[in-house]
Amino acid sequence: MARPDLHERISSLRKLRVAQERVRVRRQVGRRDGVRLEIDGRWLTGFCSNDYLGLSQQFEVVAALQDAAARDGAGATASHLICGHHTAHETLERDIAEWLGYPSALLFGSGFIANLAVQQALLSEEDDVCVQDRLNHASLLDATRLAGCRLRRYPHLDVEGAMRQLKGAPEGAAMLASDGVFSMDGDVAPLRALSLVARMQEALFYVDDAHGVGVLGPQGRGCVADAGLGVAEVPLQLVTLGKALGGYGAVVVGEEALIRHLAETARPYIYTTALPPAQVAATLAAVRLARRDDWRRTRLTELIGTFRDGARRHGFELMASDTPIQPLLCGEEPTVMAMSAALEQAGFMVGAIRPPTVPEGKARLRVTLSALHTPQQVQALVDAIVQARDVVSRQPQRALA
């Protein structure tokens, strides 16, 4: 029997995406200046990046990268366990562990890689199970599938659902994994309650706080610290370096024994080149600023309030988010795509999020705020969204939810 032709399969899938108007397109950014982006020769005010504290172009951060590149070169040249583990890597692991109140840390190339490494190294038996919130990030869900253990999911934020799923899988070792801040909804997981569930069910509680660290909690220590928890309740926690810290990579902090096990057995850690030391040096500078500059978080909180007050005043449906991620529900895909296009015409770049990233009927504008935005820019965005709604609502079959 002939094998399926991969080229034919790819062609068919492409035709289906075109018919569904779900083709994904990369937009090329020419230059950046703070929150402004040059795209297709036009300067747009961006409300779409994860640079929550505005550190990616901060002078001290860029200078640290340039100085380290001149000294150490463009790359680490090897994996951590050969000769790629530089002083900058060791210092960053130590500084982030100390900042978050954990005894140990391990640096990875990305959050996706780190989530895979954690589950592959810890959930290695067929009977092992990872119980997850249904809206967890794709990297957490894919990591379970790739690790080969069982995946059980509970309804979003449903603590009792998490308990039921753990009780229903008593045979092997168990991990309870949750986002801290959910990337598409902007809401925060009930970490205290989930930590109690994990303890009662003898499961390791693992929190992916990609969007929380730097923004929430004392000194920006994230969701775990904001909930009054630490290593005793959350033995492993993921911190990404490409969101509030403005760089690239990820760090897993945790108990010493767990971190040592990851360093010795996690294949995504062992068999990959370490991050460039210059990039790590930039993140070291960003961590210092994130810890020190409470004004960035204060300003961000004020801007979030400005946006939510303005959107509510005009009758928009908001989600339960007090974080820089502010989704604006639009309903169907054609509506959100038309809204995003209208905003671009008005000079704003806002991401349109649609299925399969979010459920059917839950397409949304994903507004993200930065400490670099001004109140005037936020108000101008609200005004532009109102105008876009009016324009789109007059088009056939275009009604904002």
Curated annotation (Swiss-Prot):
Q: What class of enzyme is it?
A: transferase
Keyword Oxidoreductase in the entry? The reply is no
Task: Please report any disulfide bonds recorded for this protein chain, giving both cysteine positions.
Answer: none
Cofactor(s) this protein requires = pyridoxal 5'-phosphate
Which Gene Ontology BP terms does the record give?
biotin biosynthetic process
Which reaction is recorded as catalysed by this protein?
6-carboxyhexanoyl-[ACP] + L-alanine + H(+) = (8S)-8-amino-7-oxononanoate + holo-[ACP] + CO2
Pathway(s) annotated for this protein in UniProt: Cofactor biosynthesis; biotin biosynthesis
- EC number per UniProt: 2.3.1.47
UniProt cross-references to Pfam families, sorted A to Z: Aminotran_1_2
User: What does the sequence similarity comment in the record state about its family?
Assistant: Belongs to the class-II pyridoxal-phosphate-dependent aminotransferase family. BioF subfamily.
Q: How does it assemble?
A: Homodimer.
Q: What is this protein called?
A: 8-amino-7-oxononanoate synthase
The protein's organism comes out as: Xanthomonas campestris pv. campestris (strain ATCC 33913 / DSM 3586 / NCPPB 528 / LMG 568 / P 25)
Q: Which gene encodes it?
A: bioF
